[in-house]
């Protein structure tokens, strides 16, 4: 992924961000974003060690990607999302699972999440992934509305899990 500078309009000023792939030194900031995300999602409990381990595994994987939105003025990571590669028999090839799309609360509603999502789609297309899918908390109406506005559609599938 090439670094892409973007300008987003905030309430009172312009914010310069760059979109890039995550690096190991980002992990503490990514863990903080996941802490914020997991307060919204009912199915997950925050555990700093587990989240750091998971992020490290994703960063080491050659077939997966973590994207970040970084504030250029102070190198603060404002947002993130991850794409993990899976094999789909329905598609006859690789597909992607988009996870952990989060923008820090103070920077929401400024287009950063949409830019991360577009970059994730671009990355998936470059990898030859045949489909992208995601799971969202059914009670997180702002997230569901956001994804629908970005052209994502609900399916008839229901997520089940066994711990």
Task: State the predicted function of each range.
Residues 86, 104, 137:
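Residue-level recognition of the GNAT/N-acetyltransferase active site
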Residues 76, 114, 138-156, 162:
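Conserved active-site alpha-helix within GNAT-family acetyltransferase domains
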Residues 17, 21-27, 32-93, 99, ...:
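Acetyl-CoA-dependent GNAT
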Residues 1-25:
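Conserved N-terminal entry element of GNAT/NAT acetyltransferase domains
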Residues 103, 109-122, 149:
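Conserved acetyl-CoA-binding loop-helix of GNAT-fold acetyltransferases
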Residues 124-135:
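Conserved GNAT acetyl-CoA-binding A-motif
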């Amino acid at each position: 992924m090439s670094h892409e500078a973007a300008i987003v309009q905030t309430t009172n000023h312009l914010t310069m961000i760059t979109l890039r792939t995550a690096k190991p030194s980002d992990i503490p900031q990514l863990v903080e974003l996941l802490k914020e995300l997991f307060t919204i999602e009912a199915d997950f409990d925050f555990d700093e060690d587990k989240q750091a381990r998971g992020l490290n595994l994703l960063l080491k994987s050659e077939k997966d990607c973590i994207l970040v939105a970084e504030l250029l003025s102070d190198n603060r990571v404002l947002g993130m999302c991850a794409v993990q590669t899976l094999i789909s028999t329905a598609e006859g090839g690789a597909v992607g699972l988009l996870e952990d799309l989060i923008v820090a609360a103070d920077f929401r509603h400024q287009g950063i999440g949409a830019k991360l999502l577009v970059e994730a789609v671009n990355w998936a297309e470059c990898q030859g992934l045949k489909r992208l899918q995601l799971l969202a908390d059914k009670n997180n109406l702002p997230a569901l509305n956001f994804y629908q506005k970005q052209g994502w559609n609900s399916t008839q599938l229901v997520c089940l899990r066994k711990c």
